[in-house]
Amino acid sequence: MSTTTIASNAVNGNHYEQLHQGRTKMYKSKVDVVLGAQWGDEGKGKVVDMLASEVDIVCRCQGGNNAGHTVVANGTEFDFHLLPSGVVNEKCISVIGNGVVIHLPSLFDEVLKNEAKGLIHLENRLIISDRAHLVFDFHQHVDGMQEAEKGGKSLGTTKKGIGPAYSSKATRNGIRVGELLGEFNLFSEKFKSIVNTHLRLFPSIKVDIDAELVRYKDYAEKIRPYVKDTICFLHTALRNGKTILVEGANAAMLDIDFGTYPYVTSSNCSIGGVLTGLGLPPQTIGEVIGVVKAYTTRVGDGPFPTEQLNEIGDLLQTRGFEVGVTTKRKRRCGWLDIPLLQYTSLVNGYTCICITKLDILDTLAEIKVGVSYRRSNGDKLDHFPGTISELGGIEVEYAILPGWQTSTEHVRNFKELPENAQSYVRFLESHLSVPVRWVGVGKGRESIINVH
């Protein structure tokens, strides 16, 4: 290699480095992300509510009204399915991103119900992406039919039309919010086309096209004030130093790629879904907060290695009030699963952890934690199984930790927790090699203990 070439490469290297640094400096702030580390229902909404008091913008990036988050603010319990949990903070803007699929009747119903509980001025602080896809009633009918056809092998879908809507998106015949707000005759033609496609595939569903078009013409005007290009909005916010928090819906083990497929949802509930669901580049991501329930729960069917079909499972279900916000189904309950958490941490790159519902374990004399998986032949697994048949055939090895058998409900300082409760937290921390920053011991935001 000549001296000239070496010099040229050095100059180019400096040039590209300068360009990279310049691009990085475009953004004066970062995007922090809250993700569910198990199968959902970890308490992400409460964590978002706590953090939302310190940020300018809170975003939803994927999923639809199949998600359910409960937030207790000033003694009032709010249930959210499409709205970001941070919407209870009147000082921040809430964003529904392009990766979300929206059933407009459910969205407006959710707004009305929560306004009746005291949610105010939403019209000034909710922004909806013009690129978000719409969920129609026929998507929900199809969802129910497809689930019924599976018989004993059902996936436990919420029947909210989420999967069929994402299918329409993937096959490029879905309809986006922006199209509803454009020329209505173009929307009408596209709506008729997608309905007719579904009628050919599912002849038994009934759709009154004319009545639906009348309804959606009304919806168009109702939603119009909320809609804008959220991608430009978020990038402008970052360049201006605005703080942004993203609330992941569902959870890592329900991710379409990384979860226990096919017992998953139809979107990416991991860190990748944040980027594609909001139009953000990787360098904008700051903290990635994994929310971990102190035990494990799951709604619906699918493998669950540490599930306890006994009095322990019943106790966790009863003490934890484990009933789905969206489905109202009882959640299956079991011990904490370290291999599962190590896997979701690997995928998501958690920078810190929030443990929730530690107080539910208060009455137990001893607590088990799943620490490794073995095949039926005794071989230890060094990875999380990629198929449900492999996962269904594993045996869990448990560590047994002493309980604390005293109430933690009113503790507000980590050092005031019982010693065994502190040890339980440190046990998880050491096995994940990720710091635990918060511990939850109750429902409200005031019950979250800052560990450090």
From Swiss-Prot:
PROSITE patterns in UniProt: ADENYLOSUCCIN_SYN_1, ADENYLOSUCCIN_SYN_2
Subcellular location: Cytoplasm
Active site: D41 (proton acceptor), H69 (proton donor)
UniProt-annotated binding residues for IMP: D41, E42, G43, K44, N66, A67, G68, H69, T158, R172, N250, T265, R329
Cofactor(s) required for function per UniProt: Mg(2+)
UniProt cross-references to SMART domains, sorted A to Z: Adenylsucc_synt (SM00788)
Domain of life: Eukaryota
Residue sites binding Mg(2+) per the record: D41, G68
Residues reported to bind substrate: V325, T326, T327, K328, R329, K330, R331
Entry protein name: Adenylosuccinate synthetase
Organism: Drosophila grimshawi (Hawaiian fruit fly)
Organism placement in taxonomy: Eukaryota, Metazoa, Ecdysozoa, Arthropoda, Hexapoda
